Amino acid sequence: MKKIILSIALAMLTLTASAVPARRTQRTLTLSDGTQVTATLSGDENYHYWKTADGRAFVMNEENIPQEISLQQAQSKLQAKVQARNAHRIAKRTKHKAAWGAETNPISGERKGLVILVNYKDKKMQHTQAEYNDYFNKAGYSENNCTGSVRDYFLSQSYGKFSLDFDVMGPVTLSKNLSYYGDNDSDGNDKHAAEMVAEAVKLAVSGIDLKKYDWDGDGYVDQVYVVYAGYGEHADAPANTIWPHEFELSEAAKYNDGPGALTINGVTIDTYACSSELRGSSGNKMDGIGTACHEFSHCLAIPDMYDTSADGENFGMNVWDLMDYGSYNGEDGYGETPAPFTSYERMYCGWLTPVELTQPCNVNDMPAITKEPVAYLIRNANPKFPGEYYLLENHQQESWDAYAPAHGMLILHVDFNSNAWKQNTVNNVASHQRMTIIPADGKLSHYNTAGDTWPGTSKKTALTDSSNPAAKLYNLNSNGRK
């Protein structure tokens, strides 16, 4: 179905009328007593653990042996670490990038990104600078089953309005072995990842004009991106590999990791992101582009749309958004064809102006979101809550949506809150997810996404206050109802 027809009774008028998350990898853990359990990786770079179906939790200790802790303890540690780090990061982000927590952040034209390739003393990259220059910049890049390069991705999402070009440096060779930088502490977190980044920066950027990587003239490089040799811990690689993440050198130093922010030739490097050269835990295939696209989207002040809380179970945007699990979409499930930006993110960046609907109507012949800047918006008619609205967008299984689980209309429910966006907690409250979907089949499930679109497998063609699922609000509408 290339063109969709959906009758929308505009319920919102009177109620009649958004680091990458852990790849959902399973592993058989051998415990100290020799017994084995099957567990799924949970959490993110802040704190991660292995969770079994019956609710047991394990972390890999410094000897790479599974150590059982209570699930509550694991979640409490993650929550405490996130809160402590967020308190510092929020202040830093809002000081140096006012767009964090803003309703819009229009961006267009050309920007430059800095990428550094890294060898460890005992582990060298299997792919060359030329290959990575193609990976980040080449038009129509198709190696390793990718749908395009990182530059292609942003050009496409912006409908040609925003070009992100990359300077790829290196590889540089670090002074220590892989196991030093990726060694885990007792909580399973990398001890020296920021030290790796700082050392790489010092080796790579001597004599370079860093001002071209400062997008807003605040004296800070918006992000330096490091690709390190070998595998990443997020995809079931050994515990002494590094978990891809975004962080600040200044914040890492507070955890005794690295020297802090670096000021070179009058420009400061603080925010960094990093990811692995290779996908999975075996073979020599380059990782997909999804993680790089996700991390550079943070430079646009776009928050994570997955549940960043300790539990991490909320649906969020799941496979439908680059800023959630969609960063892994692709033929092999490693981000070769990451999910496209939603209409919300395109609207936020100034690349799409939705058509606002104010009367009940039929929505016909909507072009795919990957092809044309078309979406429809239905706002809560209560003027006290202008940040709550529905967005309607058409997804077809082609282009960046080629690996979407279904085709048809996707209905997003947005309830913008500046603090939630600023604190990177958009979808952390199960009963009030602020950037999620209304699935046609009524099932918000990580493992049942084929029925999310309209009409979809459930053949639903109407969304009203009495339909199933029903059009609901978080805030009172103009009639005093939700």
Q: What is each of the regions a protein language model found here?
A:
Residues K3, A19-I107, V355-E356, P367:
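N-terminal prosegments of processed precursors
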Residues W100-I107, G148-N265, A375:
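Active-site-proximal segments of metallohydrolase catalytic domains
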Residues K92-G140, N177-D190, G230:
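Fold-level signature of zinc-dependent metallopeptidase catalytic domains
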Residues K2-I8:
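Sec-dependent signal peptide recognition
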Residues N137-V205, A273, E277, G326-P360, ...:
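Divalent cation-coordinating acidic motifs and surrounding scaffolds
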